Amino acid sequence: MGANQLVVLNVYDMYWMNEYTSSIGIGVFHSGIEVYGREFAYGGHPYPFSGIFEISPGNAAELGETFKFKEAVVLGSTDFLEDDIEKIVEELGKEYKGNAYHLMHKNCNHFSSALSEILCGKEIPRWINRLAYFSSCIPFLQSCLPKEWLTPAALQSSVSQELQDELEEAEDAAASTAMASAAAGGRTGRHTKL
C-alpha cells in the first residue's frame, strides 16, 4: 500500500549571489526536497562524509542570513514510505559527500533533481540550476566567491555537531584506555618478588 506523499521542491533565493549574476540574466538558487514534512538538501564541507542535511521545510533562517525563501514547486507524489526515503537519502549521501560539492558541477540543485527523479520520476525545473548550465561560459564565477558562501549554515552546524561527537567518542576511548592501563599498572605493582 503506497503512501502517496507530495514531493515539493523548496527554492531559496541566494540574493547575495544574485546581486552579481542577475545583470547577466542568471539567478542563483538553493533548493531542497520536501516530503513527509521534512526537507532534505545538500551542501559542501571539507570532509569525506555526506553533505546531505535536513531543515524545517521552507525555513530559510536555518540556511543562514543570506538565503531567502522564494517558492515551493510541487513536483509530484511518491509511494515510498518515510523509512524508505531515509534509506534513499543515506544511499545518496555516499555520492553527495561534502567534499565533492562543486557550485557548478555537483550542487544542491543536482541533489534535489536526483532525489526528485527517484521519488516521483521528475527532474527539477531547469531555471533553478541555470548557473550550472552557464558555468562553461563563466568559469571564473566560483573563484570570485568567498568559500563560506558555498556552505549553508545548517550544514555547518550539522558538520560541527558530527565532528564534536567524533571528538567526544575519541576522548572517551582515550580515557577508557588510560583507566584500563592505570588499573593494569596498579595490579602489577602489587605483585611481590618471591
Curated annotation (Swiss-Prot):
The keyword Iron-sulfur does not apply. Pfam families: Peptidase_C97. GO terms for cellular component: cytoplasm. It catalyses: Thiol-dependent hydrolysis of ester, thioester, amide, peptide and isopeptide bonds formed by the C-terminal Gly of ubiquitin (a 76-residue protein attached to proteins as an intracellular targeting signal); S-hexadecanoyl-L-cysteinyl-[protein] + H2O = L-cysteinyl-[protein] + hexadecanoate + H(+). Residues 173-184 have a biased composition (Low complexity). It is found in: Cytoplasm. Belongs to the DeSI family. This is Deubiquitinase DESI2. It comes from Rattus norvegicus (Rat). The gene is Desi2.
